[in-house]
Amino acid sequence: MKKTAIAIAVALAGFATVAQAAPKDNTWYTGAKLGWSQYHDTGFINNNGPTHENQLGAGAFGGYQVNPYVGFEMGYDWLGRMPYKGSVENGAYKAQGVQLTAKLGYPITDDLDIYTRLGGMVWRADTKSNVYGKNHDTGVSPVFAGGVEYAITPEIATRLEYQWTNNIGDAHTIGTRPDNGMLSLGVSYRFGQGEAAPVVAPAPAPAPEVQTKHFTLKSDVLFNFNKATLKPEGQAALDQLYSQLSNLDPKDGSVVVLGYTDRIGSDAYNQGLSERRAQSVVDYLISKGIPADKISARGMGESNPVTGNTCDNVKQRAALIDCLAPDRRVEIEVKGIKDVVTQPQA
């Protein structure tokens, strides 16, 4: 039995890689175990009777899972009380100890691991006999364990384990120096295994806001009648307009300058005049800093009059020129996409 136990422990020691059924990284666990404890190599002075080597064993343990590969475990073991009888001496031996081991594992399935524990035990062994009375001894012995662990839930796991402890006692002090093998069934509770909070997908970015701005300037302010050269007053008006355009700062913006005339004169002449006036405005705004590829001119001639038929009965030329003044205009259309800024959620 001893050789079999050692062979199992040595074989399991090779499986020292990631255990998927292990607790989450950097978490604690605690548990308890109960099982069959058997003492080996029990030699007692003056004892020629039966020795009850098989006893009930139990223990409690706690551990810390560093990462999927390695954990550390500390526990208390009650290895059992072993009575013995002989023709001269009758008594009992009992042992208990505190152990510290490194726990290494290997995944079989998502929920099942093979593991091994390697470390040492600080033990105390006591004897009581009708001949020598009470004696005790303390010491440190190596501990080897191997087993399988099954995760019932993320928090609760069960394990089946065989543990071997070498040389518990001093034959000169308590009359024996046995080894111990314990087969146990344990249950553990793992802390901090709750499901991670679901990741809430960020709200989709709001659709960009497309904005269009319109500005209208009177041609009589910009130009002399029947001319396409900007007046100083016209330049001053465009300076103010440029400041407004700069404040808009649209993303991917474009500026269209539309020139209009009144109905006095031929269609062809008015079309050409409206184009020249629109281009004069464009050239000036480019000189102020608007990119040339973002602004264009378009002559609209005498189309889209704003006066309608209000001037139809005006016959004198000077009066008609004054009446049709609203038709002589320059319209500036700014199109662009404005970035929508949302406030972060609290």
Swiss-Prot record:
Segments passing through the bilayer: 27-37, 55-66, 70-78, 96-107, 112-120, 142-151, 156-164, 182-191
Outcome reported for the amino acid change (mutating residue 131 to D): Becomes sensitive to phage K3h1, Ox2h5, Ox2h20, partially sensitive to phages Ox2, Ox4, Ox5, M1. Increased resistance to colicin L
The Sequence repeat ranges on this chain: 201-202, 203-204, 205-206, 207-208
Mutagenesis or variant effect for residue 86 to R: Becomes sensitive to phages K3h1, partially sensitive to phages K4, K5, M1. Increased resistance to colicin K
Outcome when changing residue 91 to R/V: Becomes partially sensitive to phages K3h1, M1
Membrane topology designation: Multi-pass membrane protein
Annotated spans, 4 X 2 AA tandem repeats of A-P: 201-208
InterPro entries: Bact_OuterMem_StrucFunc, OMP/PagP_b-brl, OMP_bac, OmpA, OmpA-like, OMPA-like_CS, OmpA-like_sf, OmpA-like_TM_dom
Main location per the UniProt record: membrane
Keyword annotations from UniProtKB, A to Z: Cell outer membrane, Conjugation, Disulfide bond, Host-virus interaction, Hydroxylation, Ion transport, Membrane, Porin, Repeat, Signal, Transmembrane, Transmembrane beta strand, Transport
Gene3D superfamilies in the cross-refs: 2.40.160.20, OmpA-like domain
Resulting phenotype, residue 159 to C: Modifies gate residues, no activity in oxidizing conditions, in reducing conditions activity channel opens frequently, probably forms a disulfide cross-link in channel, grows very poorly in the absence of NaCl, addition of reducing agent (0.05% beta-mercaptoethanol) improves growth
Record note on what altering residue 49 to V does: Becomes sensitive to phages K3, K4, K5, K3h1, TuII*-24, TuII*-26, M1, Ox2h5, Ox2h20, partially sensitive to phages TuII*-46, TuII*-24, TuII*-6, AC3, Ox3
Compartments where found: Cell outer membrane
Function: With TolR probably plays a role in maintaining the position of the peptidoglycan cell wall in the periplasm. Plays a role in resistance to environmental stress, and a role in outer membrane functionality and cell shape. Non-covalently binds peptidoglycan. Acts as a porin with low permeability that allows slow penetration of small solutes. A very abundant protein, there can be up to 210,000 OmpA molecules per cell. Required for F plasmid cell conjugation; purified protein plus lipopolysaccharide (LPS) inhibits conjugation in a concentration-dependent manner. OmpA probably acts as the receptor on recipient cells. Required for the stabilization of mating aggregates during F plasmid conjugative transfer, may interact with F plasmid-encoded TraN, but not with TraN from plasmid R100-1. All 4 external, surface-exposed loops are required for F plasmid conjugation.
Complex formation: Monomer. Homodimer. Interacts with Lpp. About 10% of the C-terminal periplasmic domain dimerizes when expressed without the N-terminal domain. Interacts with F plasmid-encoded TraN during conjugation.
Protein name: Outer membrane protein A
Lineage: Bacteria, Pseudomonadati, Pseudomonadota, Gammaproteobacteria, Enterobacterales
